Amino acid sequence: MASYGEEREIQKNYWKEHSVGLSVEAMMLDSKASDLDKEERPEILAFLPPIEGTTVLEFGAGIGRFTTELAQKAGQVIAVDFIESVIKKNENINGHYKNVKFLCADVTSPNMNFPNESMDLIFSNWLLMYLSDQEVEDLAKKMLQWTKVGGYIFFRESCFHQSGDNKRKYNPTHYREPKFYTKLFKECHMNDEDGNSYELSLVSCKCIGAYVRNKKNQNQICWLWQKVSSDNDRGFQRFLDNVQYKSSGILRYERVFGEGFVSTGGLETTKEFVDMLDLKPGQKVLDVGCGIGGGDFYMAENFDVDVVGIDLSVNMISFALEHAIGLKCSVEFEVADCTKKEYPDNTFDVIYSRDTILHIQDKPALFRRFYKWLKPGGKVLITDYCRSPKTPSPDFAIYIKKRGYDLHDVQAYGQMLRDAGFEEVIAEDRTDQFMKVLKRELDAVEKEKEEFISDFSKEDYEDIIGGWKSKLLRSSSGEQKWGLFIAKRN
């Protein structure tokens, strides 16, 4: 591993070599940079919080392809880059903006300092991948200090492997897994002089759609974090990632449901239900609660559709991005809350959701959002846990409360879709199919008991067996139901 001095010298020489041309192609290390820039720049800017009148610190500012946009809205921009010729070119382009200060400096330098809580937004595009692991950690701590409470940190990195097609004699870039950045920034915390504790809350994380559309590449990933008080309640996402969908739990579920899947029946039920959608090439599909991406890859690969998969669980999206490596399919992933996420009206041909909406308390509001997001003639297909119209037994009520579920009977669920404006609503009780699938999955796990315990643990095995048997018991007693819902926007 390179020492601090060696690492900085290697990175500086690399960028001196690749910034001779001072063009967008040189900065993006890609022959199609101009076309990509036209698509990705507005996408990245749309991902940011409102910046009107704010103070923005831009690291790795380069020749200023984002500096220009930031300067037009922000109150003040401090643009920093460690290659002198590059920051001078930025100043030549953007120097007429009187609210921009240009600094030639290395972000890892001990002399790089700003007052605590002085920045509304710290922005960087392709910076951390040119720092060592320790340098990323040190800079993250400083950025947390420099950001105002309620302020934001945005960064975008190349993960897994190279994206640009420019030839390079050597490449010192650190192509990390996205979960490296997520974990490091999530664990970052500080105390101020008064003893108040602060940390970073993940607002969203997504792959850049321009690269998915143009290169079938999901490894261009951006994050948006907000500085919050450590006692802020971010309960539901934390519950999903620390309790129900811990990384170990996701791998267990995937073992049961099949590679890429964490919902009932895996690929088999996916094929059956997707066939009902009559997908056509070029259509746009939104998968709400996409999990680890198996259904999205299936739709994109077999029907040539463009899929956007969203999930509130950071762990789920991390696995989905790993599964996407090398598949070359048109699937975008984003950590997002479907009750807060905004899409333009008439965006999607299909909205698809498998065993997810049970987590949502205000289903009528969500279904109204779905209706707006769909194009006229668009379809929604949902499978979800449901319940009997009768009052739940004490045991079932405890299960529902513990999981934070909001369950309805099948017909009431269908009526909520009608009330949201949907037509041609089909609401089917598929509990018999659910039980057959559960039995098959249970048998498969029991048959490979020793292998399962070896790969996970005895406790994991008993959790899965116990959980599946409980679901079977609740379903056979008529308490737990499984519903299939299809509806159309006219």
Swiss-Prot record:
Catalysis performed (reactions): phosphoethanolamine + S-adenosyl-L-methionine = N-methylethanolamine phosphate + S-adenosyl-L-homocysteine + H(+); N-methylethanolamine phosphate + S-adenosyl-L-methionine = N,N-dimethylethanolamine phosphate + S-adenosyl-L-homocysteine + H(+); N,N-dimethylethanolamine phosphate + S-adenosyl-L-methionine = phosphocholine + S-adenosyl-L-homocysteine + H(+)
Chain residues that bind S-adenosyl-L-homocysteine: G60, R65, D81, D106, V107, N125, V262, S263, G289, D311, D337, C338, R354
Binding positions for phosphocholine per the UniProt entry: S158, S163, G164, R168, Y175, Y253, Y385, Y399, R403, Y405, K471
Biochemical pathway: Phospholipid metabolism; phosphatidylcholine biosynthesis; phosphocholine from phosphoethanolamine: step 1/1
Residues at which N-methylethanolamine phosphate binds: Q244, Y245, Y253, Y385, Y399, R403, G404, Y405, K471
Alphabetized Pfam families for the sequence: Methyltransf_25 (PF13649), Methyltransf_31 (PF13847)
Protein task: Involved in phosphocholine biosynthesis. Catalyzes the N-methylation of phosphoethanolamine, phosphomonomethylethanolamine and phosphodimethylethanolamine, the three methylation steps required to convert phosphoethanolamine to phosphocholine (PC). In association with NMT1, regulates PC homeostasis, phase transition at the shoot apex, coordinated organ development, and fertility. In associtation with NMT1, involved in phosphatidylcholine biosynthesis and vascular development.
Family under the similarity heading: Belongs to the class I-like SAM-binding methyltransferase superfamily. PEAMT family.
Protein name: Phosphoethanolamine N-methyltransferase 3
Species assigned in the record: Arabidopsis thaliana
Gene from which this protein is expressed: NMT3
